[in-house]
Amino acid sequence: KMLDAYARVFPVKDLNFTIGQMRVPFTIDAHRSPHQQYFANRSFIAKQVGNVRDVGLTSAYRHKGDFPFILEGGLFNGSGLTNQKEWHKTLNYSIKAQLLPGKNWNVTLSTQMIKPEDVRINMYDAGIYYQNNRFHIEAEYLYKMYGHNAFKDVHAVNSFVNYDLPL
């Protein structure tokens, strides 16, 4: 099945707009390419809790100054990957900020609102990683809250330390 089909334009340096079917900008791990994965699959948070592809429009801005950061945000149809035959009245949104305070550091903060049926779901995610020549240390926390107390709130934590063996 087709996962992504989108067009991306770069009207000015460090700014882009994307329209089409794509992964929603959310979590620290969801946008890693397969060759950048640390395990056989994505983390639990990226795969099970924050794994959303949808049809929509996003914008991203990269700042490369003294305190570099990347801001991404988008509006989405809300029907998800498998049900694109109808347009929902409520648009979903996602906002993601990657703060790059030092050469080897990444702090990611993101929020997402989806409404797959009649229940609104708000998710908040915070992650941090440190990468040097051999070590990758990462931790991520996600809080998922269902509207009208439809389900209990979800707390998910993912953390790991990876050591690369030289070949």
For the regions a language model picked out, list residue spans one by one.
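Detector for outer-membrane/organellar transmembrane beta-barrel domains
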Residues: 68, 88, 98-167
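Outer membrane beta-barrel
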Residues: 1-78, 89-91, 98-106, 160-163
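Residue-level detector of functional hotspots within protein domains
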Residues: 3, 41-45, 83, 121-125, ...
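A short, flexible beta-alpha/helix-coil linker loop
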Residues: 78-81, 144-146
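Outer-membrane beta-barrel and related beta-rich outer-membrane complex signature
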Residues: 29-33, 83-85, 121, 151
